[in-house]
Amino acid sequence: MTIIVTGGAGFIGSNFVFHMLKAHPDYRIVCLDKLTYAGNLSTLEPVMDNPNFRFVKLDICDREGVYKLFEEEKPDVVVNFAAESHVDRSIENPEIFLQTNILGTAVMMDACRKYGIQRYHQVSTDEVYGDLPLDRPDLFFTEETPIHTSSPYSSSKAGADLLVLAYHRTYGLPVTISRCSNNYGPYHFPEKLIPLMIANALADKPLPVYGKGENVRDWLYVEDHCKAIDLIIHKGKVGEVYNVGGHNEMKNIDIVKLICKELGKPESLITYVTDRKGHDMRYAIDPTKIHNELGWLPETKFADGIKKTIQWYLDNQKWWKDIISGEYQDYYEKMYSNR
């Protein structure tokens, strides 16, 4: 089987590449990535010499290039991780999110229609559902929860999801969609909460926390997410959406305090900054459907996963220190210096 993995040099995509090459050593994995600021080719160094792996630098919006790749590789399955994903950046510049997340998705599905595939899988987010109130811990997102987006990012992902389902109904394209909660683990880009706090804490820099840090997220270890997608593309029902959650709800401030504790850093590093515009209060996923239909359950408890994640960042400091130099510093100063 040949699988095209878009966005495979990013956080979740690269972990999925590693998982698939290990779990299915006879599969051919073709990684397509534009290598934007969040894509890092060095992440894929461990598999570059694998004869069943190929990397192609390509923008999913490049229709001619995508069609050429399909002609060459004749993929059986496409898994689309490629996306602009940082909410703060979407607030600053929505257009690139619409281009990549919606138009890029359309190009990939058009290629699937033109050349024929067994399965197209869209990797999406629980953010398409909006948020839940903090005072209703009994409420969870299900696959039937209406789409109610809060940011340009989540709106672009919701638009892509609706387009995927429309291609299924209109053209009969064999699609599935997964909507995950917040991922964490190795190779997470340092602009996101957990790696940002780890990197800053190690450097004894301020730990910027939006608002009062009361926002709640459901955390999913990236390896568990990869296993869920593996199951969906092999056994998931065509035309269906599957929620993938970690059963690990935590307040942002509690995560930051835990990171301080694990690294032996004082909580005095925590600095409360002006809240994000339209900041969602609580995400919580009900993964009953994927459990009942496919037998998937998250294996990693947050207490264990965060220890593994922190240790990975301690052991791989060159990887993230190379990233946070240069352009990233300009972005960081813009985001946090005057808040």
Segments (PLM) and residue ranges:
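The catalytic Tyr-centered alpha-helix of NAD(P)H-dependent dehydrogenases
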Residues: 137, 149-156, 186, 190-194, ...
